[in-house]
Amino acid sequence: MPKKLKIKLVKSPIGYPWDQKDTVKRLGLRRMNQVVIKDDCPQIRGMIRKVRHLVEVEEVEEGGNEA
């Protein structure tokens, strides 16, 4: 099964450069502790790498019961 990434915003992007704020928004994260599930692809991995100090990432199996 393809992998998915569970991404959680754990630190506010306030005070960080605009490009990092924009990356957080493009990942679909709007609020603290919000979780989104994204496909594991190079583009998403690159976005995560850019804001790795603001998010927590966990790999999950597609179709799993994790929320």
From Swiss-Prot:
It comes from the Bacteria. Keywords: Ribonucleoprotein, Ribosomal protein. GO terms for biological process: translation. GO terms for molecular function: structural constituent of ribosome. The keyword Ribonucleoprotein applies. The keyword Transferase does not apply. GO terms for cellular component: cytosolic large ribosomal subunit. NCBIfam families: rpmD_bact. Belongs to the universal ribosomal protein uL30 family. Part of the 50S ribosomal subunit. This is Large ribosomal subunit protein uL30. It comes from Thermotoga neapolitana (strain ATCC 49049 / DSM 4359 / NBRC 107923 / NS-E). The lineage of its organism: Bacteria, Thermotogati, Thermotogota, Thermotogae, Thermotogales.
